[in-house]
Amino acid sequence: MTRESVNHCMNDPWWLISKGMSESLNEELKKELSQQHILYGKEAIAVARREDNDDVIFWIEKMNKYAVVHLTYTKETTSEYPITSLYSQRELEEYCKSVSKRY
């Protein structure tokens, strides 16, 4: 899956990110995850983010899912943070559209 897979559902407040920003957000996620977190040890590729908060959409190939992660910019010690929701592509499209309608 690539950024192009979700491009058609990226309306405000969502926006696709550059490769450089993706790499930076991928590293930030790694810093934040505790060993108990559902994404720990899995390759995550940032594809989009919200302009009004710290939510980032990551593609998790090993799970064949997208993860919407609310980054905290802090090293976390529990499985609860950063808050993460997993979606299939169809579910992610619905979620992003619902956020855009409320935005």
Question: For the regions a protein language model found, what residue spans apply to each?
Answer:
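Aromatic-enriched hydrophobic runs in primary sequence
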Residues: 14, 33, 62-73, 99-103
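Amphipathic protein-protein interaction modules
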Residues: 38-83
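A short, surface-exposed interaction/processing loop segment used at functional sites
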Residues: 70-103
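Generic ordered-secondary-structure signal
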Residues: 11-14, 18-21, 52, 93, ...
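Arginine residue identity/basic-tract feature
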Residues: 3, 49-50, 90, 102
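Generic secondary-structure transition motif, activating predominantly at the C-termini of alpha-helices
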Residues: 29, 33, 37, 48, ...
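Negatively charged, low-complexity tracts enriched in Asp/Glu with abundant Ser/Thr
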Residues: 2-42
